[in-house]
A protein has these predicted regions:
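Ligand-binding cleft/hinge of the Venus flytrap
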Residues: 49-53, 65-75, 153-172, 202-207
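Short helix-initiation/N-cap motifs at beta->coil->alpha
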Residues: 77-89, 132, 170-182, 219-221
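Periplasmic-binding protein-like
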Residues: 41, 120-128, 203-239, 261-284
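Extended ligand-binding regions for polar small-molecule ligands
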Residues: 61-71, 138, 143-144, 151, ...
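Acidic, polar ligand-binding/catalytic clefts
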Residues: 65, 77-139, 279-291
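Extracytoplasmic small-molecule ligand-binding "clamshell" domains
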Residues: 22-99
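Ligand-binding clefts/hinges and TM-proximal coupling segments of bilobed small-molecule sensing domains
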Residues: 155-170, 243-296
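A ligand-binding cleft/hinge motif common to bilobed small-molecule-binding domains
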Residues: 86, 102-111, 156-161, 184-185, ...
């Protein structure tokens, strides 16, 4: 399988993808000879840019690469860097064939795109500086908090503030790197995001020991690979390939590589063992949305 890299300007690509909708995903890939994989630039360990040559890696990137190698072995992979904000429209209109960032599966998004079986369950928490006295989200009442635009953390913070009668002043970064810079520079007291992504940002920072993850869990979220809606053949192929990786133990090996072992670029290990929830999902795969977890 051949590989190439493509960066995207969202405003252009959103309008360029309409023609792709008339074809099934497999037809589009077969006619073009390539498959467009949506990735992220700063979402370690799930999907992120590594090195000056802008290669991409991460847990979800590797899972996607393995799936594509099985279901479209002759296609060239073209990597397209996305953000949390433009992922939905670019997958929905067919510009991106498969989205491999850390995207939460929820009912609202299911109206726009389809999700594969869940491959990670995140917990949304807060990162603060190591010497910060903050141990609870409630202690951030009236303080500035960083969050990344387009992430579910924004809605969770709004809900938490309303439910607990606290004022959470949220400043949005365009991506996780920019949001972390708000914390790093002191312009924010905390950065709220999925625990695994917080750990990845901290591990790749200039001072990994200078930060800690604290506070109550704002929400548990199923994270999954995504693709166009109303394309059951492509969904079945992706799901079948992922389930095969789960049952063979290969998915667990990929998890260990990115969550327990040292990862690039700084060789820092996140040391995030697989949760019991994900272990159960590997035994009993499903594509249930966030709302199903809230009802449990």
């Amino acid at each position: 399988m051949k590989f190439s890299i493509k960066m995207v300007v969202a405003a252009v690509a959103v309008f360029a993808g309409g023609a792709a909708m008339a074809q099934s995903t497999f037809d589009k890939i077969n006619s073009s000879g390539k498959v467009v994989m949506g990735v992220r630039e700063s979402s370690a360990p799930m999907a992120y840019a590594i090195g000056s040559n802008q290669s991409f890696g991460g847990y979800h990137v590797e899972l996607c690469e393995r799936v594509l190698k099985e279901i479209v072995p002759k296609a060239k992979i073209e990597y397209m860097a996305l953000t949390a904000q433009n992922t939905m429209p670019l997958v929905q209109n067919g510009t991106v064939d498969i989205g491999c960032g850390p995207t939460t599966n929820n009912l609202t998004r299911q109206k726009q795109v389809a999700f594969a079986v869940t491959t990670y369950v995140s917990q949304v928490r807060a990162a603060v500086k190591a010497d910060s006295p903050i141990t609870s989200i409630k202690q951030l009442d009236g303080k500035n908090i960083a969050a990344s635009a387009g992430t579910t953390a924004v809605q969770l913070l709004r809900k938490f503030g309303k439910d607990n009668n606290v004022t959470l002043n949220t400043t949005l970064g365009k991506d996780h790197f920019e949001s972390f810079m708000l914390l790093e520079s002191g312009r924010a007291e905390a950065f709220v995001l999925d625990d695994n992504l917080l750990a990845g940002v901290i591990a790749n920072s200039a001072n990994p020991k200078g930060y800690k993850i604290v506070g109550e869990v704002l929400g548990s979220e199923p994270i999954a690979i995504l693709f166009r809606n109303e394309d059951p053949a492509f969904k079945k192929a992706v799901d079948d390939s992922l389930v095969k990786l789960m049952k063979s133990g290969e998915l667990a090996k990929v998890y260990d590589k990115w969550f327990m072992q040292p990862i690039p670029p700084k060789g820092q290990a996140l040391n995030l063992p697989m949760s019991d929830t994900l272990k159960k999902l590997i035994q009993e795969p499903n594509d249930k949305p966030l709302e199903a977890y809230a009802d449990q």
